[in-house]
């Protein structure tokens, strides 16, 4: 029986979340959202858009809450090119699964490093305004896997809020540098869910 790539990814992520839940510390205790800015990638005679909206969460893997699994999804603004002959619209979506480690803590600032996997989906919609019969651009879509490597800072702003800033490089067929800023909300008090 043949299985699609998306089905394999779904099974892998489901198994990872189930395994994380077996550990008594593997609980989601914070969620973040914000903006992502990418150096972009060329696709189908166009580029990808900025900024992106990112949503992510953290699963603590140890009692000290220094090691986390961090899944995230990002949807980027569309890139639109109008030439008078045609309109090209490119969309980019990314899913990441990173392992994050706290390098050190100084007061209310935490330095973190992370690495993991990335899946990028690109979709390009071509709309001809004037048909010549010799169009070299058409509708196109692509799916690529890659790896992330990055670092960042977590800044404590309030008892249940953090501000995070991070940068990473994505190694893939569509390699790019990505900077992200997020507001992070903690579901529980930090005394029980998160140590500083």
What is each of the regions a protein language model found here?
Residues 31-37, 69-73, 97, 111-117, ...:
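Membrane-embedded beta-strand positions of outer-membrane beta-barrel proteins
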Residues 69-70, 76-79, 147, 152-196:
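Predominantly the C-terminal beta-signal and adjacent terminal strand-loop region
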Residues 43-50, 80-87, 124-132, 175-182:
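Outer-membrane beta-barrel translocator domains and adjoining extracellular loop/strand segments
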Residues 56-129, 157, 187:
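Gram-negative (and chloroplast) outer-membrane scaffold detector with strong preference
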């Amino acid at each position: 029986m043949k299985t699609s790539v998306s089905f394999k990814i779904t099974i892998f992520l489901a198994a990872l979340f189930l395994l994380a839940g077996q550990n008594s510390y593997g609980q989601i205790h914070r969620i973040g959202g914000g903006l992502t800015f990418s150096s972009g990638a060329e696709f189908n005679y166009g580029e990808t858009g900025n900024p992106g909206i990112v949503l992510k969460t953290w699963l603590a893997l140890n009692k000290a809450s220094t090691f986390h699994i961090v899944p995230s999804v990002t949807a980027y603004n569309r890139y639109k090119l109008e030439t008078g002959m045609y309109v090209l619209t490119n969309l980019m979506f990314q899913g990441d699964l990173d392992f994050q480690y706290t390098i050190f803590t100084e007061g209310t600032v935490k330095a973190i490093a992370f690495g993991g996997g990335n899946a990028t989906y690109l979709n390009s919609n071509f709309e001809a305004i004037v048909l010549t019969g010799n169009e070299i651009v058409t509708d196109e879509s692509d799916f690529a896997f890659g790896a992330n490597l990055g670092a960042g800072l977590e800044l404590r702003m309030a008892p249940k809020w953090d501000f995070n800033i991070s940068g990473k490089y994505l190694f893939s067929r569509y390699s790019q540098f990505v900077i992200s800023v997020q507001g992070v909300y903690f579901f529980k008090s930090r005394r029980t869910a998160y140590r500083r």
